[in-house]
Amino acid sequence: MKRIFAASATAKEANAIVEHLQLYFVERLNALNREFGETRTFDAVEWYRDGGRHGGGLRYMATDDSLFNRGSVNVSQVHYDDDAEKKLGSATALSTIIHSFNPLVPSIHMHISWTEMKSTKGYWRIMADLNPAIENKSATQQFTA
């Protein structure tokens, strides 16, 4: 099976950006595994939308259960270049979920995406949050307006 990527130049550029970020994060998380965990790396799993015809993605999943309770760094690109009924041209995204076993380390969720309509109008969305398991009042004061 083979993934077919979106045809538009901006979707291709967005995919290159989020794939670069994905590898950056996976390399850093693997370095943490080597230093503090079981030295196991994140495993890559590829998936396909409609058999790859409308894209798909690559997910790196944590395999070290001494450091990460749950972890994945996902890149996906779904497109409908061949479907005149759809207004969406493509959606390209990096989504990350990292939950540590250490309760003093906050969980991290991040989503960076490029969405492009067939009218060629597109937009970036970026969101992230840190979710501490144990309250730290001085840190709360730093992040609260």
Range-by-range predicted roles:
Residues 2, 12, 86-87, 118-121, ...:
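Context-gated lysine
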Residues 2-83:
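Gly/Pro-rich turn-and-neighbor structural signature
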Residues 8-10, 93, 138:
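Serine/threonine-rich low-complexity intrinsically disordered regions
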Residues 36, 114-118, 144:
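Generic alpha-helical propensity signal that fires on short helical segments
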Residues 53-126:
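Internal mixed beta-strand/loop scaffold within catalytic domains of large alpha/beta enzymes
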Residues 119-145:
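Compact, glycine/acidic-enriched structural inserts
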